[in-house]
Amino acid sequence: MMLMMLPFIGSVSVSESLVAMTTMCLVYLILKFFQTEIPEGLLRLPGPKPLPIIGNVLGLGSKPYLSLTDMSKRYGHVFQIQIGMRPVVVLSGSETVRQALIKQGDDFAGRPDLYSFRFINAGKSLAFSTDQAGVWRARRKLAYSALRSFSNLEGTTPEYSCVLEEHICKEGEYLIKQLNTVMKADGSFDPFRHIVVSVANVICGMCFGRRYDHDDQELVGLVTLSDEFGRVVGSGNPADFIPILQYLPSAAMKNFLRINSRFTEFVQKIVTEHYTTFDKDNIRDITDSLIDHCEDRKLDENSNVQMSDEKIVGIVNDLFGAGFDTVSTALSWSVMYLVAHPEIQERLYQEIEDKVGLDRMPLLSDKPNLPFLEAFILEILRHSSFLPFTIPHCTTKDTSLNGYFIPKDTCVFINQWQINHDPELWKDPSSFNPDRFLSADGSEVNKLDGEKVMAFGMGKRRCIGEVIARNEVYLFLAIIIQKLHFLPIPGEKLDMTPEYGLTMKHKRCHLKATMRARNEH
């Protein structure tokens, strides 16, 4: 993720603007006067010279991941820009990022205290919270444990190895029927519109023990809100980088608060219902598991980490929000690439037909036998890089990296897009080529090459749902490729241009899908 300055800050009077500008100029001059001294033996961070007040905003453009990649060619893998009045260190290069987030993980494990982050999940977000002490670690461990244990529970029937597989298979089957119905009625479909609801239903089943119809207005509204959230967070809030703007009216901030309030209200309502019907001997879903843990902690006088009801809402909100946005975006991009590369789509279908057959649905256990599908997914993550940045990190103490001094509380951006398109790592990185991940005979994926792809962060802030997300993308894709053939609309050009945001989506479009002949009944 990248946070950029936006020119819109609301309607303010001329006098208010003059006062704000004067104050910002004074603060800027004071900051320049007290510029950080560099310890002996370390170097000052390189980077472009910032303008007063606005910093290097004008040099970022509408595609900051590309602008910062270009800057890294000039300044190296560790350099500094200034966004508004906040210094930001930008890290790129696989080895540099690995050094920072893994080998020096404690130094870079923080989150910056950005104004807008305080309002995400009412400040209780695992992903965005500045907290990284004992309580945060306990909450993260709890969320990870609940997510993993419920996804691995046995399915309700022997044909499914686990609850996660059961949810995905049932939603995948429903998605195929839904797309077939839409095609017969309209002749085309919006890939994002239908995929995102199916994926949302998987995480709803895991978190809340319920599913929604594809036309359910509450769920469709929340999916729309999630899309808005990604765009707003991705485009940035000026008050995050020019603190005085926190006190001026802003239509963008008002919209941001509305989005977060709606999400919190939705989850709070469901958590409250779970408290009312909670039965310790019948844990139905992740929310029940978290409530059970909360109740145990309240009874345990020796527990040094208590879990409040508000923080349960925050954890569930995090899991719900992140649980469908990343997966649905990956799947939607996958369908676009299938249409853009019909020869790859046919090769994937042939692999599934040969290794799984057409008489049963693909399962998680088939994954090792479908190396080209796994390579295709890796190349989707690499080539699209729809997660161009991680959520910003922050240094927890004065530190150094590659010989450069980085003060405590410095905001740090990780440029995942640069790593995934680095010509030092990838041959012809601009080409879409799943074979780059396969062994010479095509029988298996090269694990070392696969690990070079950066999509979920790394280190102490790595996405806790990565394994589940990868399994979801794999199984949904295997199911729909087995049954459907995706095509462009005749005469229409496929637009693969990404739209910048927290997760980069492709432009909304319509495609065609036909049932594979041998699957028609």
UniProtKB/Swiss-Prot annotation:
SUPFAM superfamilies cross-referenced by the UniProt entry: Cytochrome P450
Q: Which gene encodes it?
A: cyp1a1
Looking at the Swiss-Prot or TrEMBL record, what is one Pfam family this protein matches? Answer: p450
Show the PANTHER family listed in the entry: CYTOCHROME P450 1A (PTHR24289:SF21), STEROID 17-ALPHA-HYDROXYLASE/17,20 LYASE (PTHR24289)
The name of this protein is: Cytochrome P450 1A1
Role: Cytochromes P450 are a group of heme-thiolate monooxygenases. They oxidize a variety of structurally unrelated compounds, including steroids, fatty acids, and xenobiotics.
Q: What does the entry list as the binding residues for heme?
A: C463
Q: Which keywords does this chain's UniProt record carry?
A: Endoplasmic reticulum, Heme, Iron, Membrane, Metal-binding, Microsome, Monooxygenase, Oxidoreductase
Topological type in the membrane = Peripheral membrane protein
Q: Where in the cell is it found?
A: Endoplasmic reticulum membrane; Microsome membrane
**Ligand binding (substrate):** F229
The top EC class, named as a word, is: oxidoreductase
In terms of InterPro entries, this protein maps to: Cyt_P450, Cyt_P450_CS, Cyt_P450_E_grp-I, Cyt_P450_E_grp-I_CYP1, Cyt_P450_sf
Cofactor(s) required for function per UniProt: heme
Q: What is its EC number?
A: 1.14.14.1
Cellular-component GO terms for this entry: endoplasmic reticulum membrane
> What Gene Ontology molecular-function terms does this entry list?
heme binding; iron ion binding; steroid 17-alpha-monooxygenase activity
